[in-house]
Amino acid sequence: ACDELLVLVRQCVELGFTEIVLDDVQFPNYGRVERMTFGEQEDTPQLRMDAILTFLDAVNTELDGTGVTLSISLPADLLETQTDETAGWDLSAIAQKVDRIYMDAADQAEADTARTALSALREDADGKVFYAAETAEPVTGGSYVIG
């Protein structure tokens, strides 16, 4: 599946896309997860997190030198938990692999809180660009997407 996604990324670059937004980059974290298997290796939280980061590295390799922004959409509750071992998410590690993170924000206060928290994860990134609020209403002080 990873190879097919990388082909799609290459095609998007060739078509002139300026940003790739990844959504649902995760292992299943709801339903009957105890019945799911992920290959012959012993399934561990670290194995899942490493798989997500390896995938992001592969996408970055495809995008290297293209100027295309790599973004990811993640749930806002990840700000509090920082990790979701079932899904394979480690927010701090993911933040080092992407140019922008999209998260839900109900209002301006939530957007500001998320921007501050996420900006702390990447000192080399402009917080107003690194975090993009997914909101029903426009927010000030940064990027947003109205959903």
Give, region by region, the residue ranges found by the protein language model:
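Substrate-binding cleft of secreted/luminal carbohydrate-active enzymes
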Residues: S92, V98-G147
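Aromatic-lined carbohydrate-recognition surfaces of secreted/lumenal glycan-active proteins
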Residues: V21-D23, Q46-T86, A125-A136
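A general structural detector for well-ordered alpha-helical segments in enzyme core domains, enriched
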Residues: L8, I52-V59, A87-I94, T113-L121
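Distinct, well-ordered alpha-helical segments
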Residues: V33-E34, E80-S92
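Active-site-adjacent "subsite" loops/lids of carbohydrate-active enzymes
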Residues: A1-R10
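Residue-level preference for long, well-ordered alpha-helices that form the structural scaffold
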Residues: A1, Q41-I52, A87, E110-A114
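Active-site-proximal loop/short-helix segments
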Residues: T18-M49
